A protein has these predicted regions:
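Acidic donor-binding segment of Leloir-type glycosyltransferases
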Residues: 24-66
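Short aromatic/hydrophobic "clamp" motif used to bind/position activated sugar donors
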Residues: 86
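A recurrent flexible, glycine/aromatic-enriched loop bordering the glycosyltransferase active site
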Residues: 140, 144-149, 155-179, 198, ...
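Active-site-adjacent helix/loop segment of glycosyltransferases
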Residues: 215-307, 312, 317-322, 326
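Conserved donor NDP-sugar-binding/catalytic core segment of glycosyltransferases
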Residues: 94-136, 140-147
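A short, conserved alpha-helix in the catalytic core of glycosyltransferases
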Residues: 168-186, 190-223
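N-proximal low-complexity "stem/linker" segments adjacent to membrane-targeting elements
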Residues: 1-29
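Glycine-rich, basic loop-to-helix element that forms the pyrophosphate-binding segment
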Residues: 64-81, 91, 102
Length: 349
């Protein structure tokens, strides 16, 4: 339906040898013809490089000498890209053939749609699809404790989430971002915040985008599968480094994006969660105490980013506060039609 605007698919690999071949094959099988693929490898040591070399004639592949983190590597890929849209993709994602087309169609509905997400279903680490499909994500939402969660996560997929909806944000495992939004909300020319390194960087982008007046739409027509490694219930099984970044990024996200009004409305819930997090670090997860050392050392830079975000903020307090709920919040969105897509094409000349 949509005129074929160039879509840049950006993938970051780090010891992703189990997944990357099938991920790239699913991207190359997309029916959407106007695309470029950029892969940044963060110094993988597991054979990922050997696999990527097989795709160098169909992708741009950059091999970093060190692991600079997901956020910085995605920024690196975005800097090399030239598409009107950027699809960030995890290597453990498998896309159905119309995924990109459906995302682009949904993005044409309104010029202030800066992010588009589809319906991701859960998949095993061997890329097996369960007999009873489970939802992985249909967008992300925040609760009053400032926890960000995937909408529908681990629910049995019985045919729900069938409507186009505005949601708070998208998981960067498979999120389509409008170039105009990327440039508009970037801080110090960085879309993802490299201070995050890994984890929660997509929630930070979602919050910043909402503050700056952009919207995220969910389309049920874009379907894919994702191997989910980080879930609320499996924290103890994760590497200490990931858990440390999780703690650090919870506070980074808040320092940068939380308005005084939002804190006033939710201070009790936020404090309860902070006590739980700090108590867990002191009693059980000592390695995560490094998160607070990082915040102290980099305080001036983080505060400078906050000042810039608040200076450029466009959204009103009531609107932002309306998204923070213990139940996922969504709002009805129109479907893409031939007429809306034709208008979008005409506007582009």
């Amino acid at each position: 339906m949509s005129q074929n605007k160039l879509v840049s698919i950006t993938i970051v690999t780090y010891n992703s040898g189990r997944f990357i071949k099938r991920c790239l094959e699913s991207v190359l099988a997309q029916r959407y013809p106007s695309r470029e693929i950029i892969v940044i490898d963060n110094n993988s040591q597991d054979g990922t490089v050997d696999i990527l070399e097989q795709f160098e004639d169909r992708c741009t592949v950059v091999y970093n000498d060190e692991n600079i983190g997901f956020a910085a590597a995605q920024n690196q890929a975005i800097g090399l890209s030239s598409g009107d849209w950027v699809l960030t993709l995890n290597p453990d994602v498998l896309l159905l053939p119309n995924f990109i087309q459906a995302l682009v169609d949904a993005g044409q509905i309104h010029p202030k749609i800066g992010t588009v997400c589809g319906k991701l279903l859960a998949m095993t680490a061997t890329f097996d699809i369960p007999a009873r499909p489970l939802v992985d994500s249909t967008g992300i939402y925040f609760n009053p404790m400032l926890r960000h969660l995937d909408r529908g996560s681990q629910e049995i997929d019985n045919g729900h989430y069938l409507n186009f909806e505005y949601v708070f944000g998208a998981t960067a495992a498979a999120a389509l971002y409008r170039r105009q939004m990327i440039e508009d909300i970037a801080i110090v020319n960085e879309f993802f915040d490299p201070d995050f390194f890994v984890y929660r960087e997509d929630a930070d982008v979602a919050w910043r985008a909402q503050l700056m007046g952009w919207r995220c739409i969910y389309t049920p027509h874009a379907r894919g599968y994702h191997v989910r490694n980080v879930l609320p219930g499996n924290r103890r099984a994760l590497p200490p480094e990931i858990n440390m970044h999780s703690v650090k990024n919870r506070f980074l996200m808040r320092i940068k994006n939380m308005t005084p009004d939002l804190y006033r409305r939710n201070w009790f819930s936020i404090t309860v969660r902070d006590v739980v997090v700090l108590g867990a670090c002191l009693l059980h997860e000592h390695s995560s105490l490094r998160a607070f050392v990082y915040l102290a050392k980099n305080w001036k830079r983080v505060i400078a980013k906050r000042r810039e975000i608040m200076r450029r903020r466009r959204a009103k307090d009531d609107y932002i506060a309306s998204w923070f709920s213990y139940r996922p919040v969504s709002r009805p969105a129109p479907k893409p039609t031939a007429r809306t897509l034709a208008k979008a094409r005409a506007a582009r000349g």
